[in-house]
C-alpha cells in the first residue's frame, strides 16, 4: 500500500521558499481601461542551500517595484496589485511567486511618460534579477522568441496564442533581442519585444496597438 504521509519534523503547513518569480507590470489610462503596455519577467531563484533568513520573498519584490509608481511624476500613481504564492509539499513543481501590478497613468500621459514608465520597469526588473541571481546569458533563437512573444501576449491581454500570426519581425543581435508584431484573427495587433532587459529572453514588453479599421469603398457609389 502506498503511503501519502508527509515526513516533516517541523511545521507542516508552509508556503516554502520561492523557486520562481513571475512579475507582470502594466500601465493603463484609467481603472477600467485596457493596459497600453505590459512588461513581463520570469526568473528562477537558484540556491537550494540558501540561508532561510536570506530567502527571497514578496516584500523584496514589492520594494524593488515601488519606484515604478512615481515614474515620470513626483507623486505616486494609483495602482492595483495582486499576489499569488503556489507551493506543493511533494516538490514536483517549483514554489512560485506571481505578482501583478497595474498602474493608472491618467488619460493625458505623453510619449515621455510612456518612456519614463518603460525605463522604470526595466530598472526594477534588472534589480529583481540581481536579487534572484543574474540569469546566464544565452542567445535567443527566432523560434524561441516567437514562442515567448505568443505566450507573453496571451498572458498580458488574455488572447488565444493559437489565434495570433506573425506579421513582422526584427532581430537585434547586438542586444540579443527580437521585436515581433503579432496580429489576431479579430484584427488586434501587439508589438512584442523579447529580451527587453539586457537581452534576457524571460523579460518581455507587450504593447497593444490601436486597431485600424479599413473601409472598403469599392463599388460604393
Predicted features by range, described:
Residues 31-35, 88-92, 169-176:
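Short, ordered beta-strand-loop transition motifs
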Residues 73-136:
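Membrane-inserting effector segments that mediate pore formation, membrane fusion
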Residues 1-88:
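Membrane-active, amphipathic/fusogenic segments and juxtamembrane/transmembrane anchors
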Residues 120-178, 183, 187:
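Amphipathic, membrane-active segments
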Residues 53-73, 102, 120-124, 128, ...:
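Ampiphathic alpha-helical segments that act as solvent-exposed interaction surfaces
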Residues 163-221:
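C-terminal assembly and membrane-engagement modules of membrane-active proteins
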